[in-house]
Amino acid sequence: FPSPSSPSTQPELIEKRFQPKSAPATEKSSRTIEAQKNEPGIWERGEVKVPSTQPPTDPSSSLSGFQMSVQSGLRAYHTSNVLRQSKENEERSGVFEANFMASVLTPDIEVGDYYVLLPRLDMMLQWAQYQEKSSLLDYRFGLIKGGVGLAMPNDWNLGFGLDYNILHNISSGDKTFDSWSPSFSLQKGYAVFKNSYLMFDATARISNVAQTQVFEAAGIFADSGDNVQNSISLTLFHPFDETGKLVIVPRIGLSRTNYYKFPYKHRLDYLFSGGANLTYRWMEYYDLQGFMSFSSMSSNDIEDFEAFDIGLALSGNYRF
């Protein structure tokens, strides 16, 4: 389910990126590493993200240094626990999702000899329909996020962002919640094995939520209250050949969410998530993806739950 936390961005596998080099301390950081980490992809539940495998646009072809990209995707999957409730109350469901994303990257801003500021703007719309509990769960979600990254030597990156997101129930048309969320992230990339790339990501964010509906099944929009969230994740990008047509992306993550306002004050949630995506670039601008994810949440206030999702996705992307 969408939440006040915006989708975290993950690195993109790009041409000749299968043998990534850490920038020596005597060299300037570049947009290349930041682009690897921030290209939009399909936002998946369980915080597993499908990266775009579109080769980067030649900077010389961009208008005055600006780079723009659009992406759209369809996903169909099965979930073992549609209401995110305790095991005895689990209910299975099929889910269909559609989304559209657009991103604008501004020209690099050099800061001294070794640092580069990387401003960007991201927008996303997502729709979901559920086989079960559709009147309660079908949603329309919108997100706009502005941010700036600081690319540093040796594949270190800092990120600062502010996003606004809003969720509506499709059946009733009513707003479920909206929120403002500032965030800070730290990322580090590593070249591993022969062609693979491993990324460590740590993120802290504060969500200020205006919730207009409260559901009896608390696991449905579990983090739709004012909260502070800290998360860490490891993501591995491994291509099966030098062209990158077939890529597997396993990921594990852990988040801690602390609620600080009524009616959720003093609530503390821990969410473990893991999963993998297998992406095949079958045409120049189109990807086919198979994915699965597992999530397990423990809380001192609401019911603990586990959920397993598996499905297929089709995405298309284009860069200007």
Feature roles, as predicted:
Residues 291, 306-320:
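Outer-membrane beta-barrel "beta-signal"
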Residues 70-72, 119-123, 146, 158-162, ...:
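Membrane-embedded beta-strand positions of outer-membrane beta-barrel proteins
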Residues 60-80, 118-121:
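Transmembrane beta-strand segments of Gram-negative outer membrane beta-barrel proteins
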Residues 75-100, 132-134:
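Surface-exposed strand-loop-strand hairpins of Gram-negative outer-membrane beta-barrel proteins
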Residues 74-82, 104-106, 123-131, 162-170, ...:
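Transmembrane beta-strands of outer-membrane beta-barrel pores
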Residues 108-120, 153-160, 190-200, 241-248, ...:
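Repeated loop/turn-to-beta-strand initiation elements of outer-membrane beta-barrel proteins
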Residues 1-71:
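N-terminal periplasmic/intermembrane-space "pro-region" immediately following the signal or transit peptide
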